[in-house]
A protein has these predicted regions:
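Glycine-rich adenosyl-binding loop in Rossmann-like folds that engage adenosine-containing cofactors
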Residues: 1-12, 76-135
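Short, hinge-like loop/turn segments at secondary-structure boundaries
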Residues: 64-67, 90-95, 185-190
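Short, glycine/acidic-enriched loop or turn micro-motifs at the edges of active sites
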Residues: 30-32, 53, 82, 147-149, ...
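S-adenosyl-L-methionine
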Residues: 1-72, 114-123, 133-137, 204-213
């Protein structure tokens, strides 16, 4: 990650599809800001969305250390879902942001429930993607979605945005059942999907790029 080559296949998949200079990117499940900083470095305006308080704090620290890039990044400390309000969130106090295992309790989390037995539960604010647009956010040209099993919840809350604006989607899918349901939803919305980094895909996780080009 420090070398800047982590998840390099994501950026290779974008090449030729989107010029990010001047583009608007939503980094949903921004973690500590790795992808947000890269998007900003490529010239994009970035809305970084991260509900985990430890991750969000580290993201803020990274923005302070990178003021030139930080000018193009805004942090929104909420979870994206299919409803506006609050939802239960599973978060490990021991991780302090080192892991991306936190998730909405309603999500199809990728790991065995026992793995999360020691995690804390708290209520976090939630927002639909469509609501963000209604509140005046500029529609994204690209959405990176990595929400640990809440992918379907997030996309259901953005049906209008996806149907009308057709942003390019980079999705990390986290549950084998979600892979089926997400494909159904995106096909209905006019998207085609392509598997990325297939050699490293596992039954509980894979990466796809979805476009309506």
């Amino acid at each position: 990650m420090l070398a800047g080559t982590f998840d390099a296949f994501i950026y290779e998949s974008i090449a030729g599809r989107r010029n990010l200079r001047g583009a608007n990117c939503w980094d949903i499940g921004a973690h500590v800001g790795y992808h947000s900083l890269i998007f900003a470095g490529l010239g994009a305006q970035v809305l970084a969305i991260e509900p985990n308080q430890y991750n969000a704090d580290r993201l803020r620290a990274h923005l302070e250390r990178n003021p030139a890039l930080a000018r193009n990044i805004r942090l929104l400390a909420v979870a994206v879902s299919d409803q506006d309000g609050e939802m239960s969130f599973v978060q490990s106090g021991d991780m302090r942001g080192d892991s991306s295992g936190s998730h909405l309790a309603a999500a199809l989390a990728p790991l065995d429930p026992l793995v999360y037995a020691g995690c804390e539960r708290l209520m976090v604010p939630t927002v639909r993607m469509d609501t963000l647009i209604e509140r005046g956010e500029r529609a994204p040209d690209l959405i990176k979605l990595d929400v640990e099993g809440a992918e379907l919840l997030a996309l259901r809350g953005g049906r209008k945005l996806l149907a009308e604006k057709k942003p390019l989607l980079l999705i990390e899918m986290h549950h084998i059942c979600l892979m089926f349901h997400l494909q159904q939803l995106l096909l209905q919305l006019g998207y085609t999907l392509r598997l990325l980094d297939e050699q490293n895909a596992i039954p509980s996780r894979c990466f796809v790029i979805a476009s309506a080009d």
